[in-house]
C-alpha cells in the first residue's frame, strides 16, 4: 500500500508543480491578486504532497518493507534505527526525493516572504520558475528514479546500506548540503524573474538574504563532507 500511496502523492506533486508554473504565465493575462492566492495555495499543496511522500518512504524503511525495491537495495533488518532513517537519502532515488522536497520547502518559504509581497510581479514569476524546476525534477524521478518501485516477489532480507555510508555524518551531511545547493534556486529564480518583469531593480535586494542563508548551509555541508571524507576515505594520509 505504501508504494501505491507514494506514487499518488508524487503525481499530485508533479501536477501542482506544473500548475504553479502555468499560474505564473497566466498572471500576464489575469488579475495578479487572484494568481497570487492561487499559486500560494498550490505551493502549500506541493510541499504537503512531498512531505507525505518522504514520510511514506521513511515508514517503508522503518517497517523493513522489502517489497519496495529501493528499501531492499539500501536496508536490512539489522540496520540501526538512525541509519534506516538516513538510508532514505542514502541512494540515488531517495536523494533525489530529498532534493525536490527541500526545493518545495524553499519555495514555500519564499511564498511567505513578507518583503517580497511588495513586488507581486517578481514574487509570482519567481514562484512560477521554481515550479518549473520542481516539475523537471519530479518528472525525472517518476520516469527514471522512482523510489516507490515494487519488487515482487519481495525478499526476506535486504542488501543493506553501503558500509562507507554507515556513519553519523550521513544523517547530517546530505540534508545540509542539499539545503545549500537547492536554496540557491531562490536567488536564481529572482534573477530570472527580474528579466520578465518591469520593476526589475528590486530583485538583488530581495535575493540577498536568501543567498546568504543558502551559502551558510552550503558552507556547512561542504565542511562536514570534507571532514567525513578525511577520516572515512583516508584522504588525510
Indicate residue ranges for each PLM-predicted region:
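Polytopic transmembrane helical bundles with strong interfacial aromatic enrichment
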Residues: 1-237
